[in-house]
UniProtKB/Swiss-Prot annotation:
Belongs to the PsaA/PsaB family. This is Photosystem I P700 chlorophyll a apoprotein A1. Its main location: membrane. The keyword Electron transport applies. Coiled coil: none annotated. It comes from Prochlorothrix hollandica.
Amino acid sequence: FDSHTSDLEDVSRKIFSAHFGHLAVIFIWLSGAYFHGARFSNYTAWLSDPISIKPSAQVVWPFRSIFGQEILNGDVGGGFHGIQITSGLFHLWRACGITHSSELYATAIGALVMAGLMLFAGWFHYHKAAPKLEWFQNVESMLNHHLSVLLGCGSLGWAGHLIHISLPVNALLDAGVSPADIPLAKDYVLDAGYMAKFSQLCRGLNPFFTLNWGVYSDFLTFKGGLNPQTGSLWLTDIAHHQLAIAVLFIIAGHMYRTNWGIGHDMKALLDGHKGPVGEVGTGHAGLYEILTTSWHAQLAINLALLGSLSIIVAHHMYAMPPYPYLAIDYPTQLSLFTHHVWIGGFLIVGAGAHAAIFMIRDYDPAKNVDNLLDRVIRHRDAIISHLNWVCIWLGFHSFGLYIHNDTMRALGRPQDMFSDSAIQLQPIFAQGIQSIQAAVAGSAQAPWVGAATSPVWGGDTIAVGGKVAMSAIPLGTADFMVHHIHAFTIHVTVLILLKGVLYARNSRLVPDKAELGFAFPCDGPGRGGTCQVSAWDHVFLGLFWMYNSLSIVIFHFSWKMQSDVWGTVYPDGSVLNITVGNFAESALTINGRLRDFLWAQAASVINSYGSALSAYGLMFLAAHFVWAFSLMFLFSGRGYWQELIESIVWAHNKLKVAPAIQPRALSITQGRAVGVAHYLLGGIATTWAFFLARIISVG
């Protein structure tokens, strides 16, 4: 750690080089996933029957049956025994048009080549040709390249892949052609004879340049909704979307002024922006300098946006499943939702952390007088006290509804409960949004669209292979109540993180916080009430509330989908949901949530011993242990451990086996860091085991 430097150019070069290393790790990881798909998976069998065969790409090898661990290889259908996977890669590969393991091998090797290139680039751009600081601060060129090249050309390339490879292959697969009879992509992508089978591909680019775009409407569609055969978005709709996105981003990448004297100048934009209403001082003046000299500030904004985007992706993945047969693979749907929600939560907490680090290390009050940031900091008391009031209001009222319901149900007075069958609290605004979205197709808002974006808004159930792919999601009193719990927990998380940022440099209690740094345990001895007040401690506390918030979110999602959406569709069209619609009545009380969700659904993981799911039973216990271990760090005082260590050192000295280095107890901050890490690891792994054992056993 002696190599730490505050030289901005050197820091920028190190970060830039590390990015290439990070990309190399990602390519190696992806290569491993594709190699497993090619070598150890049942992908080709799944491709021939994605309804009754489950995805598997891991087979536990028997170790002379000493342990008997091959019990974990469950029957996933088609005579294949292995561990059921829930990554969604099989569905993605089918959407890509991959039909042979050789294509997966080629991609895996290609990813390793790319990893090697990235490692070389990381070395080259640090040791041989490191960019100058001016290059890192040239934001207009950066925006143009990221928008036009990365997002624009990236989307254009994916649109091209969808049109030339995915659409023909998926058309054949949907028509029942065996994957073995479909040629490799490399054999037909340039074969005019093959393309002639799909007449729309043979019209060339002439209609494009003559603006006669309508002739492409058979593979660039506006159908809307889901494909009833695969339960996913229409691939032709996706191709249309990606092409449109590509055009928009390529245009967007020409907006900023570089070598030619046209386009926006980012500094002029920010300096000139005063806001829509009233007098807000100097507006955004000074923000350009902040964002080009503080990578913490830049990172904080990017993390907040990317984290929010990840949570939005989580919702789109189930409402508008993008890949064929993804919607009927319930374990994968639950895993993808949970994964994207948690990733989003961690990134948003990271945004709070780096914003606070910026405030302490990079913020210069003298350069920010009466601008937007200065004005926010100066009325931070009003912001935080209002946010605190909102949290108190939401907490007491939302939790109070549950307390009321538990009390009434306990006393045998169901007619006095808040429920759909007694005192109704209908989410009328959410229901209004649903009805607007359900009716949007063909209306003035979307005249050319054939159907609403998804059946979730209201509409017919889409059944694939006797399973519900997607159906309307009814909202009622139970949803209204838990949504206010979501509002409460999210607002508390925001309160903690924002307070950490706005009071990072000073507060009435500790005026010299900026001198003490990002992480300090307490403001010295003899100064009560100043522990857990540093910016780092706000991140520490924010992590717990983030975990708390998102646990309720994923529990809500898991139970709601099992209750009201996922299930079996019978030949007469009737639907039997997994938990037979019990969410609306049971989720109204705390007791109901414990009894009918946590306890009832934990039966799968608790009773998993002796089955292929038994590893989840072991994981469930081990993760509980890790979680409980964290409490030892979170509840302890440092003095206890130091005193214990000193008595142990005394015993070693008596036996003349004392080490030369005197051991020390963890610092308060270290103890908290170890505590929160194990708390989150234990909690997440417990939930992982609970969810997967449940949904694999019933899904």
